[in-house]
Amino acid sequence: LRASASEKSEKLLTIPDGTHIECTGWQSGWAKTTYEGKTGYVSAVYLLYDGKVRADGGLRLRSGPGESYEKLLTVPDGTVLPCISQGDGWVKTTYNGKTGYVSQDYLLVPVTVRASTGLNLRASASETAEKLLTIPNGTVVQCYGNKENEWARVAYNGKAGYVSYLYIAYD
């Protein structure tokens, strides 16, 4: 756990492997969290999360991170998969004893809105984009697809759009 979102910042403490933490925000690839009374940042490289498959007909588990890689098997819609690592729109995961990659676009991850006045859902990943609606504080929404800069793609009340990563927490 570091004091700021940087490898060079002060190390506050070490969080044991396998510990469940709540992410209360994001900054340049770092998750903000509180552990043993200390608030700081953990590199997202060291975090695992679960995602739920949302693909009619299932999701292809591939041997590598791309559509050109061999299809190992199909993961059924609704299956919850562990995220081992991620990058360039692909998540490394395991299913039925096989390790491979799935497209991040077809995984749903529950996140909770952490903004006292609610969080604006925007048409695109920009503060100046059209505001579609406001999601109330404490609402759990499904985050899916790739992170675009500091924005997460979510759906709420039948509308899809983007919210700032600074105001969501992974459950």
PLM features per residue range, with description:
Residues 1-32, 54-92, 114-151, 166:
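Beta-loop motif signature
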Residues 6, 22, 32-52, 94-111, ...:
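Boundary regions of SH3-family modules and the immediately adjacent low-complexity/disordered segments
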